[in-house]
């Protein structure tokens, strides 16, 4: 799969090697620093350090300069294999390396890499020598905190991030993209457009949607429900908590407890807030008996779930502790599986298209070594998923052994306006929960059979999808999603009566419109203000418009449409909303 870095690629090796060069530079400049780990990552590299003194962004230029000096030596990267005992002796003054070495078995191969005046515990691979790295093709980009081994109980280290490319041109292109990503950061735009907030004193990873953001969310959810009804789904509502016995039966307490919030003791029972909706949907299924004639059931829920994510992993609305999944479970018979999978795929493509996403990537994950379920069911399910992708002409990669232990899956990823991939839809077979909860239906031959269950999410989570939309559009939402679609700006109080007439007409037609009759701000200042708020249309009303009974429209991109009749202007906006146009 694409996010798995290609260890043999030249760029991977360069990024791994430059991380070692950075560590050497840091040790030369700050001699008492302790080193932890420094891997290559997507778009770059990082290294974690335990500094004696606090370092700042200003120190990065100094480190970069020292790195370039080291690169000029052209020193080779030389691999050596040593014993565990030798490794413990070699790194006796490096506590984080010692921690890693102690965790290795005595029989494990331990390799080190030497380069210039630096030696690191490392599996590689690396470039042959430093001459392979263009000294103008890298940049240190940021400093962050990172707990050792990702555990909040451990010491907070200093992580220095960098990026490296094959040449200076590629580096400049990446840095330009990075600036655009910063400009579109949903956390930044969330503040500027008054969309949402997070309150650390109330709880990290818990999202508060403000009126503007809540309006957009409501539009998304209303559209979601409407389309699900059209596609033969029933919508469910289930509780937010459940007794521990439910999570024991589902297996969550055995396999997922670390990601669950702590139990709550009430009425001599233990309760947990739900990390997933599946067991609740199964509980509804198991309230009665079902015949093959009843199948399939397509049950969907905008269900809020809670997962204990580490604080360091939280990120705006993208990675949170409480979020609303657009969850659905399809419960069907063997002979219905293929058509149901195909319909889910079609539905996913349609939904994305409505929100302005046309490019996608698909990944088919197959059976891992440890798995539950019948061998024939696995083979059939993988075949069905693959055939559905082929039938709909969806290109895909196969992730061999990448499926969950309980079933194969398709992961679908959209590509946003900045070329980034986002995991969105999942179509996942489950051979585990139907067995655990003893789900049955009466087949045509009168025998009790186990139904097939398909987990399915289209948007992933509402909060995360919201953040993706903000960044995809840079906050300039398509007209149908804009919290405020039209602002009326009268040039003076004389024309206010006509402005109120327009306001009433458009409001009655369901257009989200407001009147700004504040006399203390100049018109040009108002126009700039509403452009910065990314309101699609500004109706500028002067005495000429009153006399002629017309409207002049200015868009947020400064385009001008003059002299529209009232009904023409109304139809213009209505069509933009109906067709889900950007502007």
UniProtKB/Swiss-Prot annotation:
Binding-site positions, Zn(2+): 278, 329, 455
Intrachain disulfide bonds: none
Keyword vocabulary terms for this entry: Aminoacyl-tRNA synthetase, ATP-binding, Cytoplasm, Ligase, Metal-binding, Nucleotide-binding, Protein biosynthesis, RNA-binding, tRNA-binding, Zinc
Presence of the UniProt keyword ATP-binding in the record: yes
Entry-linked HAMAP family: Thr_tRNA_synth (MF_00184)
Task performed by this protein: Catalyzes the attachment of threonine to tRNA(Thr) in a two-step reaction: L-threonine is first activated by ATP to form Thr-AMP and then transferred to the acceptor end of tRNA(Thr). Also edits incorrectly charged L-seryl-tRNA(Thr).
GO cellular component terms attached to this protein's record: cytoplasm
Highest taxon of the lineage: Bacteria
Subunit architecture: Homodimer.
EC main group: ligase
InterPro entries: aa-tRNA-synt_IIb, aa-tRNA-synth_II, aa-tRNA-synth_II/BPL/LPL, Anticodon-bd, Anticodon-bd_dom_sf, Thr-tRNA-ligase_IIa, Thr/Ala-tRNA-synth_IIc_edit, ThrRS_anticodon
Region described as Catalytic: 185-478
Protein name: Threonine--tRNA ligase
Subcellular location as annotated: Cytoplasm
PANTHER family in the cross-refs: THREONINE--TRNA LIGASE, CHLOROPLASTIC_MITOCHONDRIAL 2, THREONINE-TRNA LIGASE
One Pfam match: tRNA-synt_2b
GO function terms (MF aspect): ATP binding; metal ion binding; threonine-tRNA ligase activity; tRNA binding
Gene3D superfamilies named in the record: 3.30.54.20, Anticodon-binding domain (3.40.50.800), Bira Bifunctional Protein, Domain 2 (3.30.930.10), Threonyl-trna Synthetase, Chain A, domain 2 (3.30.980.10)
Catalyzed reactions per annotation: tRNA(Thr) + L-threonine + ATP = L-threonyl-tRNA(Thr) + AMP + diphosphate + H(+)
Cofactor note: Binds 1 zinc ion per subunit.
Location (main, coarse): cytoplasm
Keyword rRNA-binding: no
Recorded name of the encoding gene: thrS
Cofactor(s) annotated in UniProt: Zn(2+)
